[in-house]
C-alpha cells in the first residue's frame, strides 16, 4: 500500500472537468452524495481532497446501497455501489460539498481519470435531513464493466469501514442496524493466504502497468461465486459453505 500511496503522490494534479451544472452550488463547489466507504470525512480527506466545505445527512429515494462492484474475491469480493430501486426505497448517506479540485482527486482515487473508469458518475436528487429543499448531487455507480448482476457479500474489513462511516455521519439507527446485519465474506485461512499472495502479485503488476493480466482469474472467481454447484461455490468463498447473504438496506 505504501508503494501505491507514493505512486498517487507522484501523479500530476487533475484539471477540474465540466460537471453537470445542476450538481454545482452557486459558488461553483460540487455536491457529492456518499453512501459507502466515503461516508466518513476522514476517508474522503485520505483520498486526496484538501478539505471538505460542508457535510450534511441526506436521503436519495428510488436507489439502494448495493454491493455489486466486482473486485477481487475471496478477500475483497465487492465494493459498494448504488442501484435503482422502487420509489419507496431510500438510500441514506451524506452530502459532501467539495471544491472542484477536491472532487477531482476523489474521482481519481475511485478509478476515474483513465480511459475505462471503475465507476460512472450519475446525478441523483438528495433530500437533506435539515428540511431544506432537495438538491441535485453527483454520486458514483459501478461502471458496466465492474457491475455485478447481484449483490456479493463484501469483506469484513470493507463492511466495517461503511458501518463506521454510517455511525460517524449519524445515519438512522434502523439503517445502521441493517448495515450491521449484512453478512461479510469469510474465506478460509488457506484460501486467504493464496489470495494474499495474489494481492501482492496484483500490486506488482499495477506498478508495472500490467494489472489487466489477472482479469481472466478474476472472472473465473466470480463465475465460481455464482455457480449452482455447492462444491465449486465453496471453493470460491473459502472452501467452507458461505452464510446466506443478507440484502443491503433498502
Model-assigned labels for residue ranges:
Residues 2-250:
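Glycine-aromatic micro-motifs
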Amino acid at each position: 500500500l505504501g508503494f501505491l500511496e507514493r505512486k498517487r503522490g507522484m501523479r500530476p494534479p487533475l484539471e477540474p472537468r465540466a460537471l453537470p451544472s445542476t450538481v454545482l452550488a452557486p459558488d461553483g463547489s460540487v455536491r457529492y452524495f456518499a453512501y459507502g466507504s466515503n461516508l466518513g470525512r476522514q476517508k474522503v480527506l485520505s483520498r486526496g481532497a484538501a478539505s471538505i466545505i460542508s457535510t450534511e445527512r441526506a436521503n436519495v429515494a428510488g436507489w439502494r446501497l448495493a454491493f455489486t462492484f466486482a473486485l477481487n474475491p475471496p478477500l475483497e469480493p465487492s465494493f459498494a455501489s448504488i442501484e435503482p430501486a422502487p420509489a419507496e426505497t431510500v438510500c441514506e448517506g451524506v452530502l459532501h460539498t467539495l471544491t472542484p479540485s477536491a472532487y477531482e482527486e476523489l474521482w481519481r482515487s475511485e478509478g476515474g481519470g483513465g480511459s475505462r473508469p471503475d465507476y460512472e458518475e450519475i446525478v441523483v436528487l438528495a433530500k437533506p435531513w435539515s428540511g431544506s429543499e432537495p438538491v441535485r448531487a453527483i454520486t458514483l455507480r459501478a461502471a458496466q464493466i465492474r457491475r455485478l448482476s447481484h449483490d456479493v457479500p463484501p469483506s469484513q474489513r470493507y463492511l466495517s469501514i461503511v458501518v463506521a462511516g454510517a455511525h460517524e455521519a449519524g445515519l438512522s439507527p434502523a439503517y445502521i442496524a441493517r448495515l450491521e446485519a449484512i453478512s461479510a465474506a469469510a474465506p478460509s485461512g488457506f484460501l486467504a493466504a493464496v489470495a494474499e499472495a495474489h494481492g501482492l502479485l496484483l500490486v506488482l503488476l499495477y506498478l508495472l502497468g500490467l494489472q489487466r493480466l489477472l482479469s481472466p482469474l478474476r472472472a473465473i472467481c466470480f463465475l465460481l461465486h455464482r455457480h449452482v454447484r455447492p462444491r465449486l461455490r465453496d471453493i470460491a468463498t473459502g472452501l467452507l459453505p458461505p452464510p446466506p447473504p443478507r440484502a443491503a438496506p433498502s
